[in-house]
Design a protein with these regions (language model features):
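Broad hydrophobic/π-residue packing in well-ordered secondary structure
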Residues: 2, 22, 42-43, 48-52, ...
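Catalytic core of membrane glycerolipid acyltransferases/transacylases, capturing the structured
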Residues: 13-156
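Generic low-polarity alpha-helical segments
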Residues: 2-6, 43, 74-75, 80-81, ...
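A short, well-structured juxtamembrane/interface segment
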Residues: 1-12, 170, 174-177
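Non-catalytic C-terminal accessory region of glycerolipid acyltransferases
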Residues: 90-361
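Catalytic micro-motifs at enzyme active sites that drive phosphoryl/nucleotidyl and oxygen chemistry
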Residues: 3-4, 63, 68-71, 170-171, ...
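Short coil/turn segments at beta-strand junctions that form active-site/ligand-binding loops
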Residues: 10-13, 39, 177-179, 210
Length: 361
């Protein structure tokens, strides 16, 4: 569900969003495009997606014919530009592709010390061996750039600076023509509900001539049925930093308020205890936060539905009409989040703290 939208008559625009799930980029950009299809829309994605074998890593069953496939041309056709978002560590195969293109099929011992290669079983191998079926999965082990031997470490770091500068220049050139640019400056998914620091390089390069807008996203994973994604599109006012403004603008959901009760309330509780606690928390929310209208309109129905969902997932167990929280707190739709209860509570705390800071600004 969406509240707010970009204006139809707009020039160079940056749409800045937080990052929790892989589907949000497709959803937001598709809706943005179909609302105003005559407006060019540009996105960026990690350079990992522009590397040979990306599809084989994401969809292993295709590996027999995609390990040597590079999709850079396809991404360019869809107005997706590359950006380097892994500054200190990268998959070994990513470093290997860069160094192989510059130096040929070097022995792996030439670029990494033996203690880094031995756990992976790559002693005696050359760079090109990493794309072999038997090695491909292990070749995606993450390696700190600092572990590289000289002169390759220095070369990779120098290339990182040059590539980043070139990537940003390409984005600036496209947006300056009047395009709308979708970006997630966090770089990676949040794992604990708290947003990562906003990386400012691209936004700082665009802000002198482009209008900045926020796309503040929250999910409501404890509600039944399809995963509810709630987001607001609103103009960035500049009254606080982008991270604070984005966090404060996220919709407050049933899942977030219920999670706070589950972690802070009694060990066992009745359904009406949870309903009462969520109602009380709703009444105490500051005026400058946005609450899911469905929750505001019918809090009891929303909480009862969420309790039923959590019981089906065995996150809650019921005994004599009283619930208790279990250790099964993951959600299969968010594989990067080990504890969705804690995630939702942390997100609520950060949203409220950001709203307070915004109110004082």
């Amino acid at each position: 569900r969406q509240w707010g939208r970009l204006p139809a008559e707009r020039g160079a625009t940056v749409l800045i969003t937080n990052h929790q799930h892989m589907d949000e980029g497709e959803m937001v950009t598709a809706r943005t495009f179909f609302l105003h299809p005559w407006k060019p829309l540009v996105m960026c994605n990690s350079r990992r997606t522009f590397e040979t074998g990306f599809i084989a890593w994401q969809m292993p069953w295709t590996g027999w014919f995609t390990r040597g496939l590079n999709l850079s041309g396809l991404w360019a056709a869809y107005n997706i530009l590359p950006i380097e978002n892994h500054l200190f560590s990268r998959p070994l195969i990513s470093l290997a592709e860069e160094l192989r293109s510059a130096h040929g099929d070097l022995p792996l011992e030439a670029i990494l010390p033996g203690e880094a290669l031995e756990p992976l079983g790559f002693k005696g191998r050359v760079l090109g061996d990493l794309w072999m079926p038997a090695n491909f999965v292990r070749a995606h082990a993450w390696v700190k750039v600092a572990k590289l031997k000289q002169p390759y470490r220095r070369e990779v770091l120098e290339n990182l600076r040059a590539v980043t500068k070139r990537d940003i220049a390409a984005i600036v050139e496209r947006v300056r023509t009047g395009a709308t640019f979708y970006i997630t400056p966090e770089g990676d998914f949040s794992h604990d509900g708290r947003m990562h620091p906003m990386r400012g390089g691209i936004v700082e390069a665009l802000s002198p001539f482009a209008d900045l807008w926020l796309c503040a996203i929250a999910y409501d994973p404890f509600r039944g049925g399809r995963l509810p994604m709630l987001y607001r599109v609103l103009r960035y006012t500049g009254s606080a930093d982008i991270g604070t403004s984005l966090a404060a603008a996220r919709p407050i959901t049933t899942s977030a308020l219920l999670a706070a009760f589950l972690l802070e309330g009694p060990r066992t509780f009745a359904a009406q205890d949870a309903v009462r606690a969520v109602r009380e928390r709703l009444d105490l929310l500051p005026d400058n936060v946005f609450v899911d209208p469905e929750l505001q309109r019918a809090p009891e129905a929303a909480v009862v539905s969420a309790l039923a969902t959590l019981r089906k997932r065995r996150t809650l167990v019921a005994n004599a009409e009283r619930y208790s929280l279990t250790a099964r707190r993951a959600d299969p739709r968010f594989l990067h989040i080990p504890d969705m209860i804690e995630f939702q509570r942390n997100m609520l705390d950060e949203t409220l703290a950001s709203a307070r800071r915004l109110g004082q600004a």
